Amino acid sequence: MGSGDLLRSVESICSSYVSEGERRAVMVFGPRALGYGSPDDELYVLLVADKLGTGVRVVRERAPEARLSLIIAGRGALEGDVKDGLLGELLADKFLLPYVAVEGHSYLADIERRLKKRLARELLMDIASSFPRIATEMLIDPRYFLYEVASRMGRLMPAAAYAFANLLAHPRSRRKNERRMLEGFLRALRELEGEGLVVREGAFYKPTPLLVKKASRPSILGLLWRVRGAARSISRYALRALYGLGAPYMSERRAFMERFAHLADVNPLSVLPKPEDFLFLRTDIGLRPALKEVALEELAASLELTRGPDDVDMVEIGGTVNLVYLVTVRGAVGLARFIVKYFKDWKNLTWLSLRLWALGAKKFAVSGKERLRREYVMCRELGSLGFPVPRIFHVNLRAGYLVEEFIEGVNFADMLRRFFLGEEEARPVVELAEEAGRLLAGIHGAGISVGDFKPENLIAREDGHLSLVDLEQATRNKDKAWDVAEFLYYAGHYVPSISTAEEFELMARAFLRGYLDAGGSPDVVRKAPSARFVRVFSIFTPPQVIEIVNELCEGGGP
């Protein structure tokens, strides 16, 4: 901003239109006011008048130091635009950018806070409605609100994007202006925290269950938001005809072309940070963007597993309800393997799932988003408690997949098949079965039910111990007896129908012994052979296995 003489000229010109006693506030804005415009640029002035109601007028004046474009807005017009987009936010959006307060400093700061609180709330509701099942796990850098607003405004009215680009495109300018532009958002977030809609975690904010609940109200609310957004867009273009209100945008565009001539043909939004760069989830390798793709070769290098040029192989390894890939990254030095799992909605349930639902024995999570959330949350939670589960390296909520650690080893189900056929020694199988029981008891002791604790989801690692994979059905405080029943009956269906099932009994005793010795509840064991579970598995589990399970579990354990 220029000299004190210029500010005095501004006040004098304002007084010729609205007396000092009727002025609520005066501010200057735009390229000339903020120091990146040319000396020939107009100086833009916003005067807020108490007695003008919802009226708006634009006049041009000349001061000795500069040409002025004076926007005189009634207090009702400005506050209506801030609250409801009354004028397509053609007045309100001036408070998204730095400005110079001439009069009414506290009023202008309050207007900025109110606008940014409303926008932050709307964006938070949008996140919560888009990702309701995992929103409470997301960490939001406050810069997300700044750049998401810039992005949305720039898409509705492309000329508006130049103002943000002028202030934020160059790293040096960004360091100076970003902090100033965030102040109002930070004040707004503190208020939203006081209302219970977000919680602060370090430098980040997390949505709360209350926010998710508010965002899940009848879908007509979302429709109204979209209609209001469309109306704002229409009103922006209609109101450009109002003399002078479109001029500041054209000045910003000219300033951008003069300052960044080499970017003249570039969309100004492309020179700004992407909003999705500021939405995170915690993983076992730190914070990772929640909505972005990941280059697995870069991930392997960051984990220091590979070095040098990479070759990437992707092989589908099954999954009846998900797309699951084993990805191998071979560097000039080193090799890394990852599991990439895409979570689809269960539009066609497997026969077993249908049977479970029909008999009321078990309700599975069907939504792909819900199953991704459970896999992410439970791997993180159980891993933090020391349980042997895969580490999560990356999550992409938009594409519905996660990248997790590949556990090297032998599937325990394969070992059981060979054992029941007499092709595997008893000792390692019995020891691992007992370890499986201890593992399940520990997880139950943490208040978690696995939901899919079948032998296929246990991997015998090279060190001789087990890891548990596929936690997409895990949840808190559900039917723990189902976990015991599924392990035993599912393992039993590998037993040949003509077998005496002695090997199965040996394995089952070891599993139950491990479960009870590690603190598992006898009541849980006693409920495992209940009729509702037996009905589910009786179609493929030999009767001699069912009889053994009944005998071992009826008294609460062998």
Question: What is the role of each PLM region?
Answer:
Residues 456-489, 493:
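Catalytic activation segment of kinase domains across protein kinase-like and atypical kinase folds
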Residues 445-455:
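Catalytic-loop of the protein kinase fold
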Residues 483-517, 540:
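Active-site activation/catalytic loop segments of kinase-like enzymes and analogous catalytic loops
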Residues 249, 255-316:
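Juxta-kinase regulatory segment immediately upstream of eukaryotic protein kinase catalytic domains
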Residues 11-55:
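Active-site nucleotide-donor binding segment shared across nucleotidyl transfer reactions
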